[in-house]
């Protein structure tokens, strides 16, 4: 038996429990999400890695990033984007694309890169973002344990291949890894028929699900009605995610469909989505309220660092709807670790 440590930045803690050391460099990176595509191609500064040196269009938005600052491993579960990081990203980004100065910012968020540590690089900029696959049997004398870390989202299939090949070698399995040649579900090269009366919502689904969008198409009027108007997410797409994609909460639904990721940041679609989640997964009313509270709390968390202008107005209206009208407050959050984010008090 082989245990694979693929816990990202938390991999150092997992390794510690196994009695080995994987020295991680927790490098926090913050990003800004703008309300529409300011261009249709990636813009990257040709310079040594620095703050705000890449702008990436994706779906209906634009992502500007990133920063790089070392943070304590204890803080990675409760990251917050600071005002200074927002100002740095915006000032540097405007030099890259001047129109960003007048483009609405929807939210800010941060993540932590699972870099292998180096003592002589306090910022983490010079540390390789390459894949690190550790065989702890040859490295530490611990059989049946490997760590796969480093890398980036774009290289995750290569990471899977390296880890799988090492596992197969240890288990004496000689079959080749096929992840580099077998398309992911939805990426198959086949023609997809577009319904004549659903052009916009179907194109949105096609971008999210590829050839699987055919499985979501429906002639049912209710299934074709919109749950999320910003991202053109239909009832049928939500049903498909709940029935076929291992979705158990609104936040997991967001990752599958982009519900709540548009301009209103869940203000108008959260309750619609919650209704379907509750009905199809048979959640109790208490669980549903907690689900809504946790989802809206995370939306507010991303809006807080950029709460000015239209984004502040949107956040205020969301607060009035969910706290004043619906009566949702901190007591409704799903876990005691959650903290209510009231943008009006920031």
Describe these PLM feature segments.
Residues 2, 13-16, 21-30, 34-63, ...:
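C-terminal catalytic lobe of FAD-dependent flavoproteins
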Residues 7-8:
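Glycine-rich, N-terminal phosphate-binding loop of Rossmann-like dinucleotide-binding domains
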Residues 178, 183, 188-226, 275-346:
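Intrinsic disorder at enzyme termini
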Residues 269:
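Detector for the c-type heme attachment site
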């Amino acid at each position: 038996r082989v245990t694979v440590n693929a816990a990202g930045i938390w991999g150092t803690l997992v390794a510690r429990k196994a009695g080995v050391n994987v020295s991680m460099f927790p490098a926090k990176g913050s990003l800004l999400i703008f309300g529409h595509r300011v261009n249709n191609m990636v813009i990257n500064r040709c310079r040594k890695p620095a703050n705000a040196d890449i702008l990436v269009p994706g779906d209906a938005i634009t992502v500007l990033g990133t920063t790089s600052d070392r943070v304590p491993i204890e803080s990675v579960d409760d990251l917050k984007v600071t005002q200074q990081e927002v100002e740095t990203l915006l000032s540097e980004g405007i030099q890259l694309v001047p129109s960003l100065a007048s483009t609405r910012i929807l939210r800010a968020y941060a993540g932590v890169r699972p870099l292998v540590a180096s003592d002589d690089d306090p910022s983490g900029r010079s540390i390789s973002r390459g894949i690190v696959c550790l065989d702890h049997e040859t490295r530490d004398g611990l059989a049946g344990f490997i760590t796969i870390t480093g890398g980036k989202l774009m290289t995750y299939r290569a990471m899977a291949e390296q880890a799988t090949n090492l596992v197969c070698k240890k288990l004496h399995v000689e079959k080749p890894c096929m992840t580099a040649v077998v398309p992911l579900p939805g990426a198959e090269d086949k023609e997809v028929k577009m319904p004549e009366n659903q052009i916009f919502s179907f194109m949105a689904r096609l971008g999210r699900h590829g050839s699987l969008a055919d499985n979501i198409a429906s002639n049912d009027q209710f299934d074709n009605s919109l749950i999320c108007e910003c991202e053109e997410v239909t009832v049928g797409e939500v049903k498909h995610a709940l029935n076929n994609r291992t979705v158990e909460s609104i936040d997991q639904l967001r990752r599958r469909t982009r519900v709540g990721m548009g301009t209103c940041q869940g203000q108008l679609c959260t309750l619609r989505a919650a209704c379907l989640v509750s009905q199809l997964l048979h959640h109790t009313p208490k669980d549903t309220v907690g689900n809504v509270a946790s989802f809206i709390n995370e939306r507010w968390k991303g809006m807080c660092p950029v709460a000015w202008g239209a984004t502040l107005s949107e956040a205020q209206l969301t607060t009035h709807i969910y706290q004043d009208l619906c009566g949702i407050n901190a007591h409704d959050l799903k876990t005691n670790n959650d903290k209510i984010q009231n943008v009006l008090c920031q």
